[in-house]
C-alpha cells in the first residue's frame, strides 16, 4: 500500500475520532525536551617522528579508506602582489604531475585504481583528500605523498592552470553577486589580510619559482594534520602512514604574519555603479569573530534568526515575503581560527527596489541589536542548531574531519562536545545579552552594486552619505 493510499483510508477514521481525547494531548511545543546526547565514533590520535599529527577512526562498514590532510597555510600566506598563489599551488599538486610521473601518467594510474585524489586552498589552510579501496591504499597514499613531496610544476601545466584561473576571474565579472562580494571584502578587510584578493595582474605575476617555494615552505609534515578513517586497525593505520610519510623530514616553519587590522574604509554606504544592470546586489558587512570566541554559540543562534535560518529568518520574511522586494535575502557568518571572521547580509533585488530593500535590511539589523530575539525564535534556533550538530557527525569522515580542524588550529578534541553542552545550557537572556554587547550595526559597511538610473524616485542618499567605488 502506498503512503498516499494509506492516508486516504485513514481520513474517515480520523474524522470519527472523539476530539476530547485529542484535546487532552500535551502541546509538543511546551513539552520538556530531554538533553541531547550525541554518540560519536572514537577518535584515536598519534604522531609520527617527523611531527605529522594523525587522527584515526576505525570503520569497517566498507572495504575503503578515506584520508583528509590539512596544512596551516592558505591565501593569507599569499605574498603581496601575488594573490592566488596558494590556490594555484594546491591545484597543481594534483593536476601537475610529480617528478616521476607526468600529469597524464598520474591521471591514468589513479583512474585505474578508481581512486579519488583532490587538493585545494582556503583562507587559512590548504588541504588534500583521498578515497580508495583498502587493498590499493598503500599505492594511492604513496602517490599522494609523492604529489606533496615532489610536485612537477611543468611549464605547460602551470600555463594551463594560470589561464584557467584568469578565465574564472573573467567569468566572475559577469556574476554581479561575485563582483559585489569582492568589493565588500575589500571594504571590510585590509589588503594585507582577507581583503587581499586575486586579480588578473596578481595571477600573471606568479612564477614557477613562487609555486615551488610555497609548496616547499608550507607543505611539510610538521605543518600537517591527517584525518584517516576506514577499514583499518590502529596498527594497520600506523604502518600505512609511516610507510607513506615516515621518511619525510620535518622543516623549519617561518612565522605567519596574519593580519586582522581594521580596514581603512569607514562604516557607511558604498555604491559601485554599473550601467545597464537591471537588478541590484545589496550587501552589508563587518568583521566578525573567531571560532574560539566565548560568544560564538550565542551569536550564532542570533544570526540564525536574523538571516541564516532558511525561509523563516527575519531578513527573508521582511524583505521577500512581506514586501516582495527580493529574489533572495538573508545573512551569513564566517568564523575564522587565526584571524577575525566576518558577518554579512544580502538581498538580490530589482533596481527600483534597491533603496527600500537596503533600508529594511538596516532596520532588521538595528532591531536585532536593540531588542534581541524572542522566546519562540530562540527555541526554533536552538532546535535547528542541535539538529545540525547531530547530522554533522553522521559519518566517520565527518567526525575525523572536525577533529583535524580542531587539531590544526590548537583546539581540544572535545571542542565540539563542549560547544554542544554550552548550547544546551544557554538561556534566552544570555543570547540577547551577547547580542547587545557584541553586535553593532553602526559598524556595518553597506555595499550596493547596481545602476542608479534604475533606482526610481527613491534616492540612495536618503539613507546617508554615499561613497562611490570602482569595485
Regions found by a protein language model. Give the residues of each.
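Short acidic/His-enriched helical or mixed secondary-structure segments at domain edges of catalytic enzymes
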Residues: 164-183, 260-279, 317-326, 371-426, ...
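M16/insulysin-pitrilysin zinc metalloprotease superfamily fold
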Residues: 95-101, 131-162, 309-310, 334-392, ...
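Non-catalytic, conformational "gating/processing" segments within enzyme and secreted inhibitor domains
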Residues: 182, 208-244, 442-445
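Histidine-acidic residue clusters that define the catalytic metal-binding segment
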Residues: 20-44, 168, 185-224, 252, ...
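An aromatic/glycine/proline-enriched structural segment found at the starts
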Residues: 19-24, 29-31, 225-290, 393, ...
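M16/MPP (pitrilysin/insulinase) zinc-metallopeptidase core fold and M16-derived inactive scaffolds
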Residues: 66-131, 174, 193-197, 310-325, ...
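A structural supersecondary motif
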Residues: 75, 283-287, 307-349
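Acidic/histidine-enriched segments that form metal/cofactor-coordinating
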Residues: 17-26, 101, 105-214, 260, ...
Amino acid at each position: 500500500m502506498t503512503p498516499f493510499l494509506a492516508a486516504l483510508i485513514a481520513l474517515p477514521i480520523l474524522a470519527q475520532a472523539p476530539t476530547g481525547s485529542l484535546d487532552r494531548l500535551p502541546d509538543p511545543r511546551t513539552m520538556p525536551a530531554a538533553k541531547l546526547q550525541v554518540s560519536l565514533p572514537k577518535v584515536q590520535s598519534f604522531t609520527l617522528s617527523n611531527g605529522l599529527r594523525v587522527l584515526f577512526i576505525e570503520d569497517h562498514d566498507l572495504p575503503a579508506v578515506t584520508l583528509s590532510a590539512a596544512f596551516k597555510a592558505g591565501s593569507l600566506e599569499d605574498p603581496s602582489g601575488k594573490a592566488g598563489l596558494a590556490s594555484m599551488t594546491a591545484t597543481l599538486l594534483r593536476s601537475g604531475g610529480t617528478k616521476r610521473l607526468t600529469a597524464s601518467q598520474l591521471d591514468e594510474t589513479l583512474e585505474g585504481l578508481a581512486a579519488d585524489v583532490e587538493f585545494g586552498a582556503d583562507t587559512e589552510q590548504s588541504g588534500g583528500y583521498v578515497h580508495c579501496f583498502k587493498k590499493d591504499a598503500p599505492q594511492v597514499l604513496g602517490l599522494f605523498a609523492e604529489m606533496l613531496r615532489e610536485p612537477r610544476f611543468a611549464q605547460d601545466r602551470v600555463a594551463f592552470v594560470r589561464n584557467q584561473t584568469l578565465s574564472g576571474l573573467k567569468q566572475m565579472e559577469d556574476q554581479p553577486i561575485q563582483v559585489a562580494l569582492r568589493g565588500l571584502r575589500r571594504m571590510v578587510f585590509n589588503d594585507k589580510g582577507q581583503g587581499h584578493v586575486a586579480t588578473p595582474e596578481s595571477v600573471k605575476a606568479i612564477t614557477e619559482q613562487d609555486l615551488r617555494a610555497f609548496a616547499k615552505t608550507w607543505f611539510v609534515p610538521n605543518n600537517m594534520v591527517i584525518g584517516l578513517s576506514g577499514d583499518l586497525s590502529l596498527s594497520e593505520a600506523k604502518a600505512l602512514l609511516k610507510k607513506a610519510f615516515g621518511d619525510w623530514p620535518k622543516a623549519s616553519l617561518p612565522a605567519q604574519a596574519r593580519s586582522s587590522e581594521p580596514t581603512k574604509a569607514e562604516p557607511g554606504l558604498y555604491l559601485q555603479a554599473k550601467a545597464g544592470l537591471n537588478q541590484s546586489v545589496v550587501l552589508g558587512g563587518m568583521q566578525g569573530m573567531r571560532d574560539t570566541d566565548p560568544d560564538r554559540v550565542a551569536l550564532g543562534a542570533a544570526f540564525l534568526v536574523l538571516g541564516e535560518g532558511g525561509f523563516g529568518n527575519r531578513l527573508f520574511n521582511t524583505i521577500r515575503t512581506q514586501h516582495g522586494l527580493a529574489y533572495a535575502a538573508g545573512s551569513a557568518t564566517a568564523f575564522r581560527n587565526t584571524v577575525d571572521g566576518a558577518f554579512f547580509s544580502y538581498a538580490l533585488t530589482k533596481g527600483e527596489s534597491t533603496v527600500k530593500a537596503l533600508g529594511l535590511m538596516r532596520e532588521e539589523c538595528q532591531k536585532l541589536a536593540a531588542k534581541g530575539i524572542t522566546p519562540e525564535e530562540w527555541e526554533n534556533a536552538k532546535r535547528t542548531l542541535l539538529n545540525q550538530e547531530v547530522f554533522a557527525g553522521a559519518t566517520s569522515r565527518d567526525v575525523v574531519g572536525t577533529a583535524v580542524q580542531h587539531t590544526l588550529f590548537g583546539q581540544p578534541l572535545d571542542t565540539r562536545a563542549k560547544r554542544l553542552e554550552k548550547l544546551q545550557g544557554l538561556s534566552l537572556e544570555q543570547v540577547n545579552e551577547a547580542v547587545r554587547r557584541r553586535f553593532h550595526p553602526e559598524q556595518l559597511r553597506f555595499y550596493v552594486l547596481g545602476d542608479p538610473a534604475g533606482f526610481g524616485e527613491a534616492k540612495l542618499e536618503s539613507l546617508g552619505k554615499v561613497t562611490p567605488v570602482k569595485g
